[in-house]
Amino acid sequence: MSLELEKNKDQNKLLLSELNQRIAAIKLGGGKARLEKIRKQGKMTARERVSFLIDDPTVAIEIGAMAGYEMYAKEGGCPAGGVIVMMGYVSKKLCVVVANDASVKAGAWFPITAKKNLRAQEIAMENKIPIIYLVDSAG
């Protein structure tokens, strides 16, 4: 292989590694301590609720995981826009599933949360598929 090709390959591997690290951090929502607090209350986290509902989470796709990335730093951040949006099968029917992430500011909405919810609704309407909301928020 050419030197140029090897450089590009290495650069892409580095970028993919960085993306995977960011996604892993985003999947922690408001952090390990908040996730544990939710579990101690006897509740499932937003991601656990979605995984439980969807027939096969391995064939589902998350929409907008990077929403809110590096936004709202003064407020402590807003991973995934404070809401999980997945497309997957529920009882063998393709659906959009939206779940408030209570680990992010107790499920409070940020402007990016509203945009992400609207996008989820647009996707459901444009594709004529059901949308399911799993709500867990302080108000």
List the model feature ranges, each with a label.
Residues 1-139:
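Terminal-region recognition feature
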